[in-house]
């Protein structure tokens, strides 16, 4: 027990002296003398065999060696690093300095060494907190020669070894081994110091907002039908996007219910991963391609755009009908009906319906269903750019102006589509004016009277105009008087009636002339009829026997 006490005291004292020596407080001769005294004192104290006095002596000795605010840990034995050389140096013992500073440093040296044989000095630095710029300095023994170190370094001019450690984390260890060779007998004092800067770390979380915009919309739409677009905005970044704004100009050819040409949506701040959806609705006003562009912007970020192109289709069907502007009644007239699809969509279930006016009779319509005065054609599909043609042959029974109405109805992806057309024909009648002349008394005695009656009839289908009548008699007959729808004049043996402005179809008028027989013979009376429809006047002769 005494031996152990003596060893502990000796190690403590020697270490303290070494520290003073390394710091420059003691000269070499003073250090050797002090070490000898310490060893002698240790022998004396060991004989007292009192632990209390041993602790008191240790405390006083610490004060004498000027080791302030440091607690020297109990000495313990350790194995030497490197090859086992018990014959060259003794067992390693460690001196440990415990404090509340940044780095804990321990130094292990052998109890004894042999002159001329290298021995190790082991320095271990342990971070008590995160430190940077750690500098460990080792003072070489005065009567020893530097052999090598790990990590490698070179002694300075004043016999110091310096190692620099950029960073030593909390709990991290850094070990240094120095090999020295004693040159003469005596005590080899060595000391190590450490200097470090504590490292304080703080964390600021940095992120980057990333606003993305996508847009959904139809590839095709119908004219004057609502077109809806969905604008999807999402923050795919790692930070809040501030003041997010979406601008959507109204595309050319579109109209918005607000009347504005640029729509602006303020979304405010968007958290990472947050998603917003905006719905816009437009009304297309013309056919063609329209591109809707949405642009999103936010504070400090780049603008992003998304666009959708929509083809605006117009379902369209056109129909036309062509026929004679006029014709005579009972004469056939052909109408040509043309149906076309100038639009962008396929027309389905196309129905072409031709309605004729009353008084017109359908004579022929190929491929159609005929019902009274209605003609109907049906087609399953009519592709864009395709056209069809139909013919119908009709005849009017009576004069007049009659209209032929055609309506086309169809279905498409954009709904129903209708078109109509008409053609008007003026049907003319033909006037057929006839005349009949008879005498009421035949034969007639001289001095008696007879009456010539003239009936004018329009047997045609149209009126006749400016109907004129003139009668000429032979010398045996003398006109006495006359009557009729118009006035007349008697000039000698001739009677002329004023023109009748109009003689309607199937209308009959009668003229009469009273004649006196003035001489015997075979008398003659000639009636001459003219009108606008009679290119050559018509004459009729009646004879009367006078005795």
From Swiss-Prot:
Disulfide bonds: none annotated. Residues 23-40 form a propeptide. InterPro entries: Chlam_OMP6, Chlamydia_OmcB, DUF11_rpt, Ig-like_fold, OmcB-like_DUF11. Residues 1-22 form the signal peptide. GO terms for biological process: regulation of cell shape. It comes from the Bacteria. Keywords: Cell shape, Disulfide bond, Periplasm, Signal. Residues 62-79 have a biased composition (Basic and acidic residues). It is found in: Periplasm. It holds the Pfam family Chlam_OMP6. Changing residue 458 to S: In strain: DK20. GO terms for cellular component: periplasmic space. The keyword Lipid biosynthesis does not apply. Residues 46-83 are annotated as: Disordered. One of its GO terms (molecular function) is extracellular matrix structural constituent. Residues 52-61 have a biased composition (Basic residues). In elementary bodies (EBs, the infectious stage, which is able to survive outside the host cell) provides the structural integrity of the outer envelope through disulfide cross-links with the small cysteine-rich protein and the major outer membrane protein. It has been described in publications as the Sarkosyl-insoluble COMC (Chlamydia outer membrane complex), and serves as the functional equivalent of peptidoglycan. The sequence shown is that of strain DK 20. Part of a disulfide cross-linked outer membrane complex (COMC) composed of the major outer membrane porin (MOMP), the small cysteine-rich protein (OmcA) and the large cysteine-rich periplasmic protein (OmcB). This is Large cysteine-rich periplasmic protein OmcB, serovar E. The lineage of its organism: Bacteria, Pseudomonadati, Chlamydiota, Chlamydiia, Chlamydiales.
